[in-house]
Amino acid sequence: MSQAEIVDIPTNVITGFLGAGKSTAILHLLKHKPANERWAVLVNEFGEVGIDGELLGGNNRGEQGVFVREVAGGCMCCASGFPMQIALTSLLSEARPDRLLIEPTGLGHPKEVLAVLNADHYQSMLDLRATITLVDARKIREPRYAEH
């Protein structure tokens, strides 16, 4: 990937309600990433697991080939996605990753996040791959699972 352009970054969105295990799943993926690759993670908020602190030890961003950025200003899917766009563009520019993982809040609907990622601006930059939805099997019978 040249310094001038960012193209076709394999991108996965990891969704699920709060407590479904999104952060834990992302940590697992990051711990098994190829050593020669740079991965970026865009998170809506740092959850109980704490991807940033757990994996990166706080101040050594990028030293393990992992860059984490939090979306400031609330939900990724709110306010036309502007906070998400700002954080994503900054993360891509800084990290120049080989793969991008996105963890939206468990409170919003991922369709708004996917709409931002499918916008013209990101068409050549991102290669959207599978959207992974995690489900807490203990709560599968709750109405919200059927509604979303």
Named regions from a protein language model:
Residues 2-15, 20, 24-148:
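Nucleotide-state-sensitive switch-loop elements of NTP-binding domains
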